[in-house]
Amino acid sequence: MNKHIQFRAIFCVFIASSLSACQSQFVTTPNLPTEANLVANSVNNGLETELNIDYLVAFKNLKMAYGRCVAFTGEHDFVFTDNKLEQDLEMGTLFARTEGGAYLSKTLVESIGKNKTRLTLFLPTGYKSAQARFKLDAKRALGQDPSCNAAKPI
């Protein structure tokens, strides 16, 4: 009987940890009240890199990653993600916001040629570990974050 209880306890811990593997706590401060405030008061006026991937694929990869690993994972509040794809402009925008609507981040994905994408991440000044977050978003745009990019890139 005792082994049965131990097995059930271990099984429950395993299930709970596997269900929450991707849902790490997302920092909800600092934040800014509007998109314009965020862009005007962002780390380095936006962190930017070029990636060797089509912008549509990068956008879809980020959309998947944000949906799996950013949305609803705040320390004390919910985090909401939103996105907008503008194919006529060959660009996509992804946002993370607090439950009250304040902006946590803005990510731009823009085509700069065949299979070339400019990724720009806007984080509020004072955001801790901005470079680490930027590298993680670049990895996610490439579809290389196994925790958050469940499907393989197109």
Describe the residue ranges of each PLM region.
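Extracytoplasmic/secreted envelope proteins and their assembly/folding machinery
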Residues: Y55-K63, K106, Q131-K135, K139
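Acidic/histidine-rich, surface-exposed loop or edge segments in extracytoplasmic proteins
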Residues: A36-G46, N115-F122
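Bacterial Sec signal peptide processing site at the extreme N-terminus
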Residues: S18-V39
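Surface-exposed short loop/turn segments
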Residues: F72-K114, F122
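Post-signal-peptide N-terminal segment of Sec-exported extracytoplasmic proteins
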Residues: V39-T81
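C-terminal partner/receptor-binding element of secreted or periplasmic proteins
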Residues: R118-I154
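A short, structured loop/turn motif at beta-sheet edges
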Residues: L51-V57, V109-T117
